[in-house]
Structures are given as structure tokens and as C-alpha cells.
């Protein structure tokens, strides 16, 4: 029998899986265009000129072009008033060519994010953050119109890798509104037994060691060590943390919340960082946009 030292986890290649999904979506968009003479449309609203936000928006624009989704880019100055931003959102709500609206977060401090997210029409809320969509996600027997993209991507990675969720013990590390909380609710809906580990949790490693599935979304580089992982567990690492690396041109490299080198010797399945969850988030945004358009087209 192989010793634990030469065990290597199966790498869940998010890039390859996302590529497959994007090909499926492109085919669907072609079909919609032929049948209805229209294509799905995604509006991305960006406020100010944050470099990271612009990078994300460019990635989304390129992804839309690749699958045939029409992009509507709305750039507003940093000093835009909350009222003007809401009125722009309302304008997009009433535009029949727009089937999804995404407001790039974070917003400047003088704007209340909750007010903006609440202003997006629930049937165009492709980010899945509208309070009514999250509320439906939390309730048994209700179906939200859209699921948040990163949590949806995490479950899609598990499903497409053949990882069983039903009846398994899942531990989610982190409880943010963007990932931790909604992914816990999604796992619960999929019949996992779910525990959330957060900053006030006593003895987190003991809890994580019990998990058949670990979703790491705490935003702390290499917080989760290899010996915290149950042998054979599936590990989905949502973290993207910049750590100093003088050997890189940029001076830093991206690492996850899990110590990949250690954990991959113990886990059954693991996602790399980068190239794991990130590409799936964009693929799920495209999927949500197409689903929104299909509802409008009466499909």
C-alpha cells in the first residue's frame, strides 16, 4: 500500500471545468439567438477607478464576448451620489436588452451598498445578493431566482468532480455575506451536515479535521494546515491572498487559505490557487445571465 507521504490529492482544475461550462453556455447563446433573434445582455456598473475592480470588469467583459453575451459597461465617477447611482440602476432595470445587472463592489464609503443592491430588480440580480434572493436561499422549499456566483461555483466544482455532498460533513471556514454564509446555505440545501468555523470558534482545527468537505473562505493565507485535513476530504479553497515573493516580477504571489503543498498530501480532492474557484465565479455569472434571459424569452 502507498504510504501517506506519496499520496497526492486529485487536483480540481477550475480553469478546465470553467472552460467546459463556457463552451456549453456559448452553444446555448447561439441557440437563443437563432430562436429569438436576441442574445442575453449583462450590464456591469463600476464606480471610480480602483485597479482591482477594473481588472475584474475587464475579465467579465472578455468572458461575455467569448460566449456571445452582450456587455453594457457603465462607468461612473468616484464622487457619484447614491441617488444618481440608484437612478442608473433603475434605468438598467427597465432596459429590456439587459438581463443581468452587476454592481462591482466595493463601492466608495459615501454609498450604502445595501441600498444599491436592493435597488437591482430581483429578476436581474445575477450576483444573487438581493435580500429576497438570499432570503429564499435560506428558506426550505423556496428557490431563489439566482444563486451567488462563487458559492454556486464551489458546488459545481464538487458536482463535476464526482464528490458526494448528501449526508457528508461539510465545514465552511468563514461567514461572509459573499461566500461563507451563502455556501453554507447551499450545502444545507444539498443535504450536507454543515458547520461554520469563524473568528470566535474554539478549536477550529478539531472541527475541520472532522470534515468530508472543507470550503475555505476566511481570507487568511495558509491558515488551514495539512494536518487539519481529514484523509480523503475534498477541499475547495476560495481564498486569494497576496504574499510577498521577491522572485516574482510583481513582488508577490497569490496563495489560498489552505496550505496547498501540505494539504494535497492528505486530501482526496483539492482546488489550486489560482486556477480553482476564480474561473468558476465568472462562469457562474455568465450562467446566471443566460438563465435570466431565458426566463424573459419564455424558455
UniProtKB/Swiss-Prot annotation:
A GO biological process held by the record: tetrahydrofolate interconversion
Record's protein name: Bifunctional protein FolD 2
Pathway info: One-carbon metabolism; tetrahydrofolate interconversion
Oxidoreductase in keyword set: yes
Statement: the UniProt record of this protein carries the keyword Hydrolase: yes
Function: Catalyzes the oxidation of 5,10-methylenetetrahydrofolate to 5,10-methenyltetrahydrofolate and then the hydrolysis of 5,10-methenyltetrahydrofolate to 10-formyltetrahydrofolate.
Signal peptide (residue range): none
GO cellular component: chloroplast; cytoplasm; cytosol
Protein family (similarity comment): Belongs to the tetrahydrofolate dehydrogenase/cyclohydrolase family.
Keywords tagged on the record: Hydrolase, Multifunctional enzyme, NADP, One-carbon metabolism, Oxidoreductase, Photorespiration
Swiss-Prot/TrEMBL catalytic activity: (6R)-5,10-methylene-5,6,7,8-tetrahydrofolate + NADP(+) = (6R)-5,10-methenyltetrahydrofolate + NADPH; (6R)-5,10-methenyltetrahydrofolate + H2O = (6R)-10-formyltetrahydrofolate + H(+)
Molecular function via GO: methenyltetrahydrofolate cyclohydrolase activity; methylenetetrahydrofolate dehydrogenase (NADP+) activity
Enzyme Commission number(s) from the entry: 1.5.1.5, 3.5.4.9
Highest taxon, organism lineage: Eukaryota
Assembly description: Homodimer.
Residue stretches spanning the membrane: none
UniProt cross-references to InterPro entries, sorted A to Z: Aminoacid_DH-like_N_sf, NAD(P)-bd_dom_sf, THF_DH/CycHdrlase, THF_DH/CycHdrlase_cat_dom, THF_DH/CycHdrlase_CS, THF_DH/CycHdrlase_NAD-bd_dom
